[in-house]
Amino acid sequence: MILLDDIEKKYDFIFPALFKQLWSDGMLDWMNGRTAPFNSDENWAKTIYPEIKDNPPVLLHSGGFDFEMLRAKEMLDFQFDELWNIEEHEFIPFAKTDESNVYAFYKNLKVDKEYAIVYIWNDMNETEIIAKNFEDFIFRKMLEAIFDIDKDDLKGDYKKSGFDGYKIDLLSDLKSIRPYLNEQYVDILTNFYARNAQESMFSYGLISKDELVETIQKHLVFKELDSVFEHEIE
């Protein structure tokens, strides 16, 4: 069994208190404790998901349709691209997308004594600073989860229930993360998630673009927010 201490030693890094608490409570484990490979008649959607969907780990539904938390072994054994300048830029990966873009703590930048969160593009030499700490990262992802929700993405995961099914799952995410977020963030998300959906030709939403931008600017802003830098070897 891989301990968080093992990962901290690997990267010479101390995870923030919130990350440690979520880890301890199983809230970062999308595998529900399973480490063994699946049998031929098993897969994650069939075997694991039904066990965790009603009390979901962090961002299970609200992280985005292509978002996935890394397993402990994936964090420990993460293979950095040979083009990444990891001597200059110290990343501690914790999540990824289907396109192999990576979410990571950025050891080079501390804001109010906590490490910033970055989004590293796999097919471009760009890394974006997206949050000043892990709590803000969760809050931002849960805000973005209710803006411009593509109907084609919904069809893929919610064939019969559509947006209504998606909203039920979002509310489950909010319920499970509620004890870990500050009261202000919980209140904001609760109010937005309680809305009726606005529908356009291609998408649904519970929040407008202006509201999303305004909320981010009001609650998440810091000097380096949304700035971009190159991470590859010159």
Identify the residue ranges that each predicted region occupies.
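An amphipathic alpha-helical core segment
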Residues: 150-201
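A near-ubiquitous, low-amplitude feature marking generic local secondary-structure context
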Residues: 2-6, 77, 88, 117-124, ...
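Generic low-polarity alpha-helical segments
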Residues: 12, 19-20, 24, 67, ...
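Compact, glycine/acidic-enriched structural inserts
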Residues: 115-153
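Short, well-ordered strand-loop elements centered on a beta-strand within folded domains, enriched
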Residues: 102-122
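Short, surface-exposed, charged/polar-biased interaction segments
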Residues: 28, 36, 40-43, 115, ...
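A surface-exposed partner-binding patch
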Residues: 1-102, 109-110, 186-234
